[in-house]
Swiss-Prot record:
Annotated family: Belongs to the ATPase C chain family.
Lineage start: Eukaryota, Viridiplantae, Streptophyta, Embryophyta, Tracheophyta
Name recorded for this polypeptide: Uncharacterized ATP synthase C chain-like protein
A single BP term in Gene Ontology: proton motive force-driven ATP synthesis
Compartment(s) of residence: Mitochondrion membrane
Domain of life: Eukaryota
Species this chain originates from: Arabidopsis thaliana (Mouse-ear cress)
Length: 315
């Protein structure tokens, strides 16, 4: 062994140690990323199903205790990056445990609120000494049904199309002498409030509201169908007029688009406005001098139909 080779041995050992330390750091980082992915999926599953939080908290707690024990056993021997990685593991485990505990607390609070809020609301609106609504066979309070009923009434009032039974004033027993002056008619807001004060459960009014909603839906469908029929009639009429004027379009969608643009209005307007514009356009196409024909020709030329030219305009 030469002197040069003998002197190069310490350098080789230092290089091997550096390579080993780098490999250990990379392996530790990879393990940290893998563990992070596992715990991330675990938190997502717990958030979707909070009932698993109790078992998960126990598992994470045991893992955390094991990590703490490993840290105390090896902290005095580990130095450099590995010691920092163990610190990061501890912080990560603590964060995961806190997140799972928070999820469990929110889940328990969500289960308790339906039992606590209805009695408070009942006392706040003046329930006082009146008996609380009875509970069902499953032990669940019927407050949810009462709140659903009142919310349905509010939705009906906001739509402006409530049934006549909802808008009728509630007849109450009048106290005092028979010759007392009649009370003034209650405003619609007061009538609605009196109706909301009633206890829930009259099936006739629910059926009336359902029938009213069905009637409104049927009217909307009728108007929509009429608009679609008018649109189809407009396209057919435009094809006939274009054919009479010697214009042939390769794509029928060009006619439909030109009709829409010739209305000089946005397509996303109300159904009633669409129907009115289609009716006016149909009437104009049926006359000898169509006021909307020239804008219609302009739109066709803008779509790239070279067959449409100045001779197709109406003077």
């Amino acid at each position: 062994m030469t002197k040069r080779e003998y002197n190069s041995q310490p350098e080789m050992l230092e290089g091997a140690k550096s390579i080993g330390a780098g490999a250990a750091t990379i392996a530790s980082a990879g393990a940290a990323i893998g563990i992070g992915n596992v715990f991330s999926s675990l938190i997502h599953s717990v958030a979707r199903n909070p009932s698993l939080a109790t078992t998960t908290v126990l598992v994470v707690t045991l893992t955390l205790l094991g990590g703490v024990a490993a840290f105390y056993l090896h902290s005095f021997r580990l130095k450099g990056p590995l010691k920092k990685i163990i610190y990061l593991f501890l912080v990560f485990f603590i964060a995961v445990g806190i997140s799972l505990i928070r999820i469990k607390a929110i889940h328990l609070l969500g289960l308790a609120l339906p039992l606590l809020v209805p009695p408070l609301v009942w006392n706040a609106i003046g329930g006082g000494g009146e008996a609380l609504p009875s509970t069902g066979p499953n032990g669940a309070s019927s407050y949810s049904e009462w709140f659903t009923y009142t919310s349905d009434l509010e939705d009906s009032a906001s739509s402006g199309r409530t049934s006549s039974s909802v808008n009728q004033p509630i007849q109450r027993e009048q106290a005092g002498p028979s010759n007392a002056l009649p009370e003034p008619a209650a405003s619609p807001v007061a009538q609605q409030q009196d109706h909301l004060d009633q206890p829930f459960g009259e099936g006739g009014e629910r059926e009336a509201r359902a029938q009213e909603h069905d009637r409104i839906s049927a009217e909307v469908e009728t108007i929509t169908s009429a608009c679609e029929n008018l649109e189809a009639a407009m396209v057919r009429k435009a094809h006939i007029l274009l054919h009479q004027r010697g214009v042939t379009l390769g794509d029928p969608e060009d006619v439909k688009r030109a009709l829409q643009l010739a209305l000089h209005d946005d397509w996303e307007h109300d159904i009633d406005d669409r129907k009115r514009h289609f009716t006016v356009l149909r009437r104009d196409f049926g006359t000898a001098r169509c006021e909307r024909w020239n804008p219609f020709i302009d739109e066709l030329r803008g779509l790239g139909n070279r067959q449409v030219n100045a001779r197709h305009y109406v003077d």
